[in-house]
Amino acid sequence: MLTTRRLNAYIAATVMVLAVLIQQVVTEGLLSDFDRSARLTARSIRASHDVFSVTVMLGLRGIILTVCLPILGWVSLKRRSWLPIAGFLIVLVFETGIAGALKISVGRIFPYQYESFFSRMMIGQDEMAFPSGHAANCVALWGYMVWYFTQAGSVLRRAGIWLVVLASCIVGVSSWLIRTHWPTDLFAGYAVGFSALVAVIGLYTALGFNPEATTHYSQEAHRETADAQ
């Protein structure tokens, strides 16, 4: 289970990462130079837009909701409890709210806006690149599903974590290659998603809603997930 000490450490670490990234982006520090270099590298690679515009959708909110909500709805209905789906929705609100507030306050343009005359004309109207919502969605929402339906220390939990990491990397690399986000946007998105996920896990644990509270409860969650799938 997530202890208070670990929760505080995780939140503090992600806040520090976000603070550094925001400072570097706003002041155009060394990481901004890295971003510009990464954009030129991605442009020179000329990756297939058709392929990577599909793989980046692993972090698309609509697709994640389409997959997860029916499963969570089924489990909530069968258990006659709002807890499974409510936790997911709280994570969604947290990460969307944090990411949205940062997008508005930082006001950063997208890499592709350098690519054509028309896109450059849009500068000043569409400055919502930082942080990446796709990266935040991937960590927060897929991460919640892994946490809720697996037991700590189990093979399924470890496999699920690695799948979330893999999906997050695919989203990040895809977004970089098709130049929809700067690398620092993606790192910030990961931090936002992780902080939202950890906050909700901490909340559920503090309220006694953690599915690992009893062995019986955890086994029931496994059975219901299998039924829903």
Where are these regions (language model features)?
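Membrane-embedded catalytic cores of phosphoryl/pyrophosphoryl-handling enzymes
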Residues: 116-229
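Hydrophobic, aromatic-rich transmembrane alpha-helices
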Residues: 66-78, 143-148
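Interfacial segments of alpha-helical transmembrane regions
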Residues: 5-13, 70-98, 161
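Transmembrane helix-loop junctions in multipass membrane proteins, especially transporters and channels
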Residues: 27-32, 80-81, 104-112, 180, ...
